[in-house]
């Protein structure tokens, strides 16, 4: 009897999902909502047609001209083709799945134009589609005067052939283009109504050659295929296996409408541009009786959020309590008036139960999500990522895997105690201490900042709603007020330039401040780069679907940070004191933040702090034994319910 759980290898062998993934990876096609506006020569809309589900394709006609084909939904929808020689792109909101293409009618100046307003695009698919369009435009040969006249007088070309994938030589030719980037607009402007065709060759933004390393491993690609099929799934893996990276890739591959990104903590939610699971659910802490939780969820704003949700992403699932998950499942069915598990919502769940457990009061034993009564009905597929990306040293990887499973041999103890002598800082950058308690973090950072000579430079955040600053404090990795001095130890809390090593968790020291403007800090990072750090923006979603934003420097003081807030980070140089470890998995989370054993210093190591919950060990052991958790511990009724909710293709 199958439990409905499978391994990444099985997922890789599924032909239907492989074919689906192939279709999804075509950068010349895009499926989204499209509003077609026919504009007058003055730029005013004369006619508008809204298509809820349309397909855009890049191709060429029989004259090898670049064309855009718009296919309306349904068998009766007639395709329309637009020449792209004079297209103008408006891409300011591409990161949210929206963009606009303005095309002069038939490429003839003065004949008005057609405007395609794209929305609800999977952001990553939209980015690749626009990138392909820019590249093909950049290397397309421009017609001379005679050939242009011949084309206008000749018959209208009818054939349409999808363009070929971008070739390396096309990237090189595009990168060699020296023209200014005048044809790519950041946002539509009412005054910009000229239909004059741009000069050839079209200018493009600076483009880099793609890396030969695939973006996703085979394991990660298997997870993505399952998600794109509409399958509810839980994917797990040890620290550093790329769970956060994959989750962001998944979110970029799904339509924004109907996709709700959540996490168990505010910081984790902010990393994926979402909200906390509690804020979305709208039932408070979930400790109230089920009837009261349902009443809270039926409030107009909360109820609409549940009704609109088609795909629910939950990150850091290890910190979600079983009873809360069961109540969410019951609320979803009741509010949506559907008997399907979780009210028919596709669940995309990520996390590692061998990391931080749910927070409980007193000595109460935490109940993990996989112990929830509804877990098996709601999560028919579990995939485990096994390839570690954060650490390259196989010895360190093996050590961490042993600690993850609660095993601390004499050799592991010897290696960790030996790190106490490591000199993990250099060039004025000292190791970040990971603390078990947030109070210790605040006291440590405040003490060391006061000890530095010189003036304090304060940087105050700009919040979209100052009255909700406390909400932003809880969900943003940056504080309302950041105080710095010359010599302050800092850490980046956002990726700025991955190729240059300026990534989330990169360590540095303040070496100066600009003399003009706001006096922005100059930071020398451990990777050797000195950079002026400028304001960045964080956006979080709160109860009722409202969005809040905070503008602040992407820095935090880094003499110390808490183990809880370090979850998901990769740190260059780390100092750890595990004397006050109070939860299973806490020591593993702390140790696994380090990129290498050489960048780790462990003080007063005691093997007894390495522990994990036996129930979690059993969960993962049974997962690896066959195709997933055994049904032997479930009663027949629950087992039958599980099988009813299995995908028949598995």
Curated annotation (Swiss-Prot):
The highest taxon in the source lineage is Eukaryota
Question: According to the UniProt record, which cysteines are disulfide-bonded?
Answer: none
Upon deletion of the gene, what happens?
Mice do not exhibit any change in telomere length in thymocytes or plenocytes nor significant change in chromosome gain or rearrangements.
Q: Its principal location?
A: nucleus
Q: Does the keyword DNA-binding apply?
A: yes
The record's section on Gene3D superfamilies has: P-loop containing nucleotide triphosphate hydrolases (3.40.50.300)
Q: What is its EC number?
A: 5.6.2.3
Q: Which cofactor does it need?
A: Mg(2+)
GO BP annotation list: DNA recombination; DNA repair; mitochondrial genome maintenance; negative regulation of telomere maintenance via telomerase; telomere maintenance
* Disordered as annotated region, ranges: 171-199, 631-650
Indicate the quaternary assembly. Monomer. Interacts with telomerase.
Q: What is this protein called?
A: ATP-dependent DNA helicase PIF1
What is the native source organism of this protein? Mus musculus (Mouse)
**Source organism phylogeny:** Eukaryota, Metazoa, Chordata, Craniata, Vertebrata
